Amino acid sequence: MMTLLAILAVSYIIGSIPTSIMAGKMLKRIDIRQFGSGNAGGTNAFRVLGWKTGLSVTLIDIAKGVIAAVSVVAFFRMHPIGAYPDINEVALRLLAGMAAVIGHVFTVFAGFKGGKGVSTAAGMLIGIAPVSMLIVIGIFLLTVWLSRYVSVASILAAIAFPLIIAIRKYVFELGGGLDYYIRLFGESFSFHDSLDYHLMIFGLIVALAILYTHRANIRRLISGTENRITFGKSA
């Protein structure tokens, strides 16, 4: 139990790093939450700080999820403290990743007012199911490019994830997942692309959560007042 609590605590702290808020204060000496949509996430960083900074913020927020789901769990596997909980590996990584997402949304470093958690959740799932997430990222990027609405892309990507897991697992009968091997710089690396049923359940919950956190965006989309991003502005 102590190990599980340590994993969740470290993951929460990693997720709490307020990337967009730090970028706003360092680059323009502003609180990004007072501009644009008022959200402390990558999407608002694109609007307020420009696409280069927005992209950097988004990538760092994604990395927070990857680190929580992969590195933190792996570290405590090698250096356990107390009794290790008897829990499914994928479920454990999901718990660690969710702790990071909660940290991003309710950051302890910025008055518990952070972003919406989309990028950090994506990072967590990249660490657990990278192939499925590559498909989801493709859907996200294509939707952003065609519509210029990051909110629409986020919603569609969230809905697509559990569907992709289900199709790969049951239609293509890939079971619990696949192991992949790559060779870089003369070294061989392996990674597991999970199709565990926990992912489908989690994916459905995330899709509902994304719809809930984007309810204001949905209202603006219906009224035609939702902000579009541009790719010509830089900071």
Swiss-Prot record:
Q: What is its main location?
A: membrane
- Catalytic reaction annotation: an acyl phosphate + sn-glycerol 3-phosphate = a 1-acyl-sn-glycero-3-phosphate + phosphate
Choose any GO biological process term that the UniProt entry carries and state it. phospholipid biosynthetic process
List residues traversing the bilayer. 4-24, 56-76, 94-114, 125-145, 152-172, 191-211
State a single Gene Ontology molecular function: acyl-phosphate glycerol-3-phosphate acyltransferase activity
Membrane topology qualifier: Multi-pass membrane protein
One of the record's GO cellular component terms? plasma membrane
Q: Where in or outside the cell is it found?
A: Cell inner membrane
Query: Which domain of life, per UniProt?
Result: Bacteria
EC number in record:
2.3.1.275
Q: In which pathway does it act?
A: Lipid metabolism; phospholipid metabolism
Q: Is Cell membrane set as a keyword in this record?
A: yes
Span of the secretion signal?
none
Keywords attached to this entry: Cell inner membrane, Cell membrane, Lipid biosynthesis, Lipid metabolism, Membrane, Phospholipid biosynthesis, Phospholipid metabolism, Transferase, Transmembrane, Transmembrane helix
**What is the stated purpose of this protein?**
Catalyzes the transfer of an acyl group from acyl-phosphate (acyl-PO(4)) to glycerol-3-phosphate (G3P) to form lysophosphatidic acid (LPA). This enzyme utilizes acyl-phosphate as fatty acyl donor, but not acyl-CoA or acyl-ACP.
Oligomeric state and partners? Answer: Probably interacts with PlsX.
Question: To which protein family does this belong?
Answer: Belongs to the PlsY family.
What is the protein name for this chain? Glycerol-3-phosphate acyltransferase
